[in-house]
Each structure stands twice: as structure tokens, then as C-alpha cells.
Design a protein with these regions (language model features):
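Cleavable N-terminal export/targeting peptides
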Residues: 1-29, 190
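Short glycine/proline- and aromatic-enriched beta-strand/turn motifs that initiate or cap beta-hairpins
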Residues: 21-74, 186-190
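Residues that define the transmembrane beta-barrel architecture of outer-membrane proteins
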Residues: 29-31, 45-51, 82-90, 106, ...
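Extracellular loop and loop/strand-boundary signature of outer-membrane beta-barrel proteins
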Residues: 38-41, 76-83, 130-136, 168-172
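Membrane-embedded beta-strands of outer-membrane beta-barrel proteins
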Residues: 51-55, 90-94, 146-148, 152, ...
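Gram-negative (and chloroplast) outer-membrane scaffold detector with strong preference
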Residues: 54-129, 187-190
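Predominantly the C-terminal beta-signal and adjacent terminal strand-loop region
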Residues: 72-74, 149-190
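Extended low-complexity acidic/polar segments
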Residues: 123-163, 187
Length: 190
């Protein structure tokens, strides 16, 4: 009996102390809610920023789809004032995981998204404070984005996001391209 008890204790000890177990991540069907924000075209003054939220889901091949919405504010200097351009866009995209560490704590993905939304310049007011008239008009915009995103798992359910994205939107009377640098947090809900 002592021999079996000793064998049992040895096996259990080896099982408990032989290595560290990690939670499984990027499983098919897992879903998360993302909150993100950052700078648009650098952090020049006046401040250009974006903020957004998204829902993402993981596929059987450890990739993910993303559906979300975003608000982008970019200011253009005019004399000693700024003229704001705001974009409200919806996004639908797919991200491919191409790199991860052995512990499955850090993942690097590249993705493409389709974007569509509305852009307003100076909140629809075409007359500036000095009597000048803006030629830029409010418009519907459409296009896409390419994103490089790093996901770092802080816990099994909380993920820190860092990304760089290049947006291209047609229909705008101002810039065609916008570069974004940002951070975010994702909460795994399923």
C-alpha cells in the first residue's frame, strides 16, 4: 500500500510542478468587445484623434473577423483658428494572425477592412469666422484600411491592443489617406 501511495504522490507532484499550463486563446467561436483610440496623422497641434469600438470573433484557423464603428477628428489650421473634419465610419474586416510567441501571450495580425460612413467639415458651416467660404463639403465616404495589430493578453479575458492603420477613403473633399496610431483594450466575452 505504501508503494502505491508513494507512486501516486510522485505522479501528482510531477504533474503539478513539471510545467506551467496556459489558457487556450484564439479558439474558434470566441468573441470579444474592443475599445480603441489614438492619434491620426501623428499628434500635431491641434490634436487629431480617433476613437472606436468593435466586436471581433475568432475563426477555426486562428484568424478573426471584426465589425465596428469609428469616429475620427482631424483639424486643419486656418490663420489662427482650426477647421475640424469629423468622420463617422462603419467597418467590416478580416485579420490574419501571422506571428505569436510560444506561450500564446502575444499575437501579431495583419488585416484588411472595408469602411463606409459620413464626413462633415466644420460641422456643416461653410462660412468661416472671417467671411471666407469653405469649398470642402460634407459627403459620404467609402474605402478601406490596412491594419497591423499587436494583441497582448494581460489575463485570459483582457487583451491590450496596439496598432497602426492606413485608411483610404474616397468621396472626401480633403485628404484621401489617413494614418492612425493607437491603443485599445479587448474584453473576451465568450
Amino acid at each position: 500500500m505504501k508503494k502505491y501511495l508513494f507512486l501516486f504522490v510522485t505522479v501528482v507532484s510531477l504533474a503539478l510542478f513539471s510545467g506551467r499550463a496556459h489558457a487556450q486563446r484564439y479558439l474558434p467561436g470566441m468573441k470579444g468587445v474592443e475599445l480603441r483610440g489614438g492619434f491620426a496623422n501623428g499628434s500635431k497641434s491641434p490634436l487629431n484623434y480617433y476613437t472606436g469600438f468593435a466586436v471581433s470573433g475568432y475563426t477555426p484557423k486562428a484568424n478573426r473577423w471584426v465589425i465596428g464603428a469609428e469616429y475620427l477628428m482631424k483639424n486643419y489650421g486656418y490663420r489662427n483658428a482650426s477647421v475640424p473634419r469629423a468622420q463617422f465610419t462603419a467597418e467590416g474586416g478580416y485579420y490574419l494572425k501571422f506571428l505569436s510567441d510560444p506561450t500564446k501571450m502575444v499575437f501579431l495580425s495583419v488585416g484588411g477592412s472595408a469602411l463606409a460612413g459620413y464626413e462633415t467639415v466644420n460641422w456643416g458651416d461653410r462660412m468661416l469666422y472671417d467671411g471666407s467660404t469653405l469649398l470642402a463639403k460634407d459627403a459620404f465616404v467609402y474605402g478601406g484600411a490596412i491594419t497591423l495589430e499587436l494583441e497582448a493578453y494581460l489575463t485570459d479575458r483582457i487583451v491590450l491592443l496596439a496598432g497602426i492603420r492606413e485608411r483610404v477613403l474616397w468621396g472626401s473633399s480633403l485628404d484621401l489617406f489617413t494614418t492612425q496610431f493607437g491603443l485599445g483594450v479587448k474584453f473576451i466575452i465568450h
